[in-house]
A protein has these predicted regions:
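Short, conserved helix/loop micro-motifs enriched in His/Cys and acidic residues
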Residues: 1
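Vicinal oxygen chelate
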Residues: 4-13, 59-85, 88-165, 173-237
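Short N-terminal helix-initiation segments at or just after the protein's N-terminus
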Residues: 5-16, 44-49, 88-93, 128-136
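Core segments of cupin and vicinal oxygen chelate
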Residues: 10-49, 159-176
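Conserved short beta-strand elements that form part of the metal-binding/catalytic scaffold
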Residues: 30-65, 70, 123-128, 192-198
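Short regulatory "switch" loops immediately downstream of catalytic or recognition motifs
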Residues: 78-88, 168-173
Length: 237
């Protein structure tokens, strides 16, 4: 048989909180019940998710996760980010819920991916469809450090290990370092700091970004990092 559909069923502490959050991302409710057990079904175009409520559930202890494959991670990220900005005035980058940015994943053959961590602590992992050509492998020590840190923070959820990797790279500057890669590492270190509830370090890293001199061509290459920096600054204000 063909055309079967799998829909993940994920835990949460409150289906009301889940509905409110996913509506911000453009989902609508397809089914909801309170008894005998609270659960809800949500849909956004071809993306279906279902959730069940557990009394006393701690989102910080959740192992809930699922994969979403799409032809354009950037487009879906921008749609989710626009919804967050409209509802919250910023993109949520720390705490629960939050969202990471699309980045090439070393542990996914270089394909782009980002994650939505919802109010239930579930990681909705969005990846580029494998039919799309992956990004080139990073070169240079900063690029490699960035790739390793992304695996730790954005895939494993270990922001502290990511911070250690980035701090080590930033603590040993080299005259051959690509200034664009430096901007990207500084911005990502700021994001990791916010996940770790360390706004002072985030502010410091963003200030260092402003001091990196780039040519016009380099600034164009760093456009995504500067956009991320703008979102981080808004989240800090």
């Amino acid at each position: 048989m063909t055309n079967e559909v799998t829909v993940p069923l994920l835990p949460c502490a409150s289906i009301d909180d889940i509905v409110a959050f996913y509506e911000v991302l453009g989902f609508h409710t397809t089914y909801q019940q309170r008894k005998p057990n609270p659960c809800v079904g949500l849909q956004r175009e071809d993306l279906h998710l279902q959730f069940f409520e557990i009394a006393g559930f701690d989102p910080a202890q959740s192992y809930g996760s699922c994969l979403v494959l799409t032809s354009d991670t950037g487009q879906l990220y921008r749609a989710f980010a626009a919804g967050m900005r409209a509802a919250y005035g910023k993109v949520l980058v720390s705490g629960t819920p939050r969202m990471t940015r699309p980045r090439a994943r070393k542990n996914a053959d270089g394909l782009s991916g980002f994650s939505v961590i919802d109010p239930g602590g579930n990681w909705i992992r969005v990846f580029q469809n494998a039919s799309v050509s992956p990004a080139s492998a990073p070169t240079g020590r900063l690029g490699k450090a960035m790739a390793n840190a992304v695996v730790q923070a954005d895939s494993r959820g270990d922001a502290r290990q990511a911070a250690r990797i980035l701090d080590s790279a930033l603590g040993h500057p080299d005259t051959d370092d690509d200034p664009v890669a430096l901007v990207e590492v500084l911005v990502y270190r700021a994001e990791v700091a916010m996940v770790l509830n360390d706004p002072a370090t985030a502010i410091e890293m963003l200030a260092r970004v402003d001091r990196v001199a780039l040519s016009a061509d380099q600034a164009t290459r760093a456009a995504a990092a500067y956009e991320a920096a703008t979102d981080l600054a808004a989240a800090l204000s």
